[in-house]
């Protein structure tokens, strides 16, 4: 008997979420897809106009030869395979500080690093992060208010998912910007509010520009709930002056706007 299910119900490009179709993540977009195909053509010996493809679409230093931080890799290897610590020649292979750090982590992770942790992250790591922030900034940090994420993208998605309720909620994004933000806003159904960095002033952030962006959004019925401040800038690389940061904080306090400080 022929399946009576309508073809319209089969998952395809036309009936998936239109928010997914509309999301544009330029750093992994069409140009990157084409470049990937060209790289495969080169590997397969097909004739092309190039003999090598260099991907510069994302910050990926190890892909172009940067060595990973040795300490982290060494500690990770011991934590992943604790049996190495029992080897009589361990001190010939691993530095003393690496061995001590690995033992400390293994003591705190009673069931091993393969077990699920607290949703915020391991408690002892949260305390270490809080202590680091306090030493760096001179301001006491509460470890209960710290969340560890699997990279910045997950943290950004978690936060935007929390504040975006409908298409009347807007987020101020710098132009130029890192396209992850606009792509996520499309997926979540929020509204992008552009504010433009001043190229003539080293890609600085003008408070007057923020005022205009907020006023324009509110005139259209959009509620500016948050602002993304990327510092150092991505892709511009500029660093905000301290006074500029203070101005932004005061402005957001007066306008009841949440600051997303992207300081990767």
Where are these regions (language model features)?
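N-terminal "arm"/small-domain region of PLP-dependent enzymes with the aminotransferase-like
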Residues: 2-120, 131
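Walker B catalytic acidic pair
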Residues: 263
